[in-house]
Every structure is written in C-alpha cells, then in structure tokens.
C-alpha cells in the first residue's frame, strides 16, 4: 500500500469544498425559496410606509411571498470606522433581481427585508455580502395568476445619508414623485428613501402609450454640501416576457438641488 504525503496544495484542494460551504453560509436567504410556487389571493400592496424625516425601505405588514428576506452573518467594519465611531458610513449589500442590481440596506445585525412584487413566471434573486462579495442565489417560478409589471423604473445611488428622488412623468401628464406617489393611470412609487442608497421603484401594470420622461432630483445630503453621488436608473419594460428589455443608466449628481432628466422614451 502506497502512502501519499498531503502537501500544502493537496490540503488546499481537500479543504476547498468546506471553505466554499462556509462562505455561502455567511449569506442566509429565507425567502423567496427556490422551486415552484403558486401564490393565491390578492396581490400584496406595492406601497410602503413613509415616516419622515428618516424614511427607509421597510417591510411593515408584508407577507413572505412579497419579501426578499434573510441575513448576512459576517459584516465588514464600516468605512472610516474607528474606536467608538458610530457615524461611519454603512456598507450596503448587493441585491440582484432578475438581472437588475441595486444596493440592499442591512440592519445592525445583518438582517434585511426588501418588499418586491413578483409577477407570474421565472425569477432569479441573488444577495451579495458587502466587502467579501460572497453570494447566495435562488431561482423560482411563480405559477399563480399574478399581475405583471409592464414598466418598472428603479432608482438607486451609491452614498449613505443622501436623499435622491425619482420623478416619472407619463404621456398623460401625470407626475409621480414623493409628494404624489399614486397616479390614476395605475402607476405608483413604492417609497421615498431619505437616508441613502435607495432604491425607489416606480411600477405600472398598464402604462399608457406615448412619451415618458424620468428625472432624478438631488434633494439633500444633511449638513454636507459637497457629497457627489452616482445615481443608477434601470428601466425595465415587459418584465417577465420574451419581449423584456432592460436599460441601465448612471449619472453623477454633484450637489443638492440638482435636477437631471436621465431618460426619455416611447412606449407603444
């Protein structure tokens, strides 16, 4: 019987599967679960509660079928943090839903709960831990009769403690923004985030045909006046169908008060 010495290379290869398992365990994704599901009943409310002055993405009153929820167990030290520094910038996780990437704010214990309205069909969700990039992915098929989103506009940005606002003007002149979040034509804005990162999401199941205009306003940055933040705008049409189209735009926002028309487009 031959004996084979376990050198450093062999040891690393032997431990690789265990290391991968340990890394993936850092990211816990409770819902949505992978596989096949048929959600029954009325579709959950798209709108979130807004409580000023510090308004965040929140999951108040949502059932599990309308949430992306879980926990990241190992968090990096906040950027610029020192001993006793409670004001260091947060580092968000990264959420990717059906190919659209956006920041995911975390609680102090690493927990997250992001409302999301999934239509019928196949969906993919990925959560990436900040700093390490360790990810957890799931795919599922929603077989229930769910209302599809024919137009979704997602605004996110890359700085903490800043307030950017999404403004969507429909062809019929209806203007949806934080001051008027629900339009008579069926379009709605889910939340007004005032504490950094976003996202703010406009969605419509029946967008009227014609010219659409999307603006981003740099509303404020607290006492700071020199915070440059990069806004990301994703425009998704015919979501979950063979005709689905995604476009992503990135625009630097240099100072509070700046209003930028990011995208104009036509819908048939």
Each model region followed by its residue ranges:
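Surface-exposed, short loops/turns at beta-strand junctions within beta-sandwich domains
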Residues: 115-122, 208
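Short, compositionally biased P/S/T/A/G/V-rich stretches that sit at domain boundaries
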Residues: 25-62
């Amino acid at each position: 019987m031959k004996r084979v010495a376990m050198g450093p290379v062999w040891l690393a290869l032997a431990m690789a599967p265990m290391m991968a398992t340990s890394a993936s365990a850092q990211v816990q994704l409770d819902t949505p679960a992978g596989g096949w599901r048929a959600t029954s009943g009325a579709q959950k409310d798209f709108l979130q509660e807004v409580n000023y002055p510090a308004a965040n993405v929140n999951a108040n009153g949502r059932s599990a079928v309308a949430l992306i929820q879980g926990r990241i167990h190992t968090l990096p030290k906040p950027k610029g943090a020192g001993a006793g520094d409670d004001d260091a910038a947060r580092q968000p996780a990264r959420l990717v839903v059906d190919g659209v990437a956006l920041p995911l704010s975390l609680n102090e214990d690493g927990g997250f709960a992001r409302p999301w309205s999934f239509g019928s069909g196949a969906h993919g969700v990925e959560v990436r831990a900040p700093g390490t990039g360790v990810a957890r992915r799931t795919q599922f098929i929603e077989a229930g009769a769910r209302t599809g989103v024919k137009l979704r506009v997602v605004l996110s940005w890359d700085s903490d403690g800043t307030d950017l606002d999404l403004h969507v003007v429909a062809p019929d002149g209806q203007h949806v923004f934080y001051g008027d979040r629900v339009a008579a034509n069926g379009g709605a804005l889910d939340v007004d985030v005032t504490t950094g990162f976003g996202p703010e999401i406009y969605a419509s199941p029946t967008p009227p045909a014609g010219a659409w205009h999307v603006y981003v306003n740099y509303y404020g940055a607290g006492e700071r006046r020199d915070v440059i933040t990069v806004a990301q705008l994703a425009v998704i049409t015919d979501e979950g169908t063979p005709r689905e189209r995604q476009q992503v735009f990135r625009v630097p926002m240099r100072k509070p008060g700046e209003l930028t028309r990011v995208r104009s487009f036509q819908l048939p």
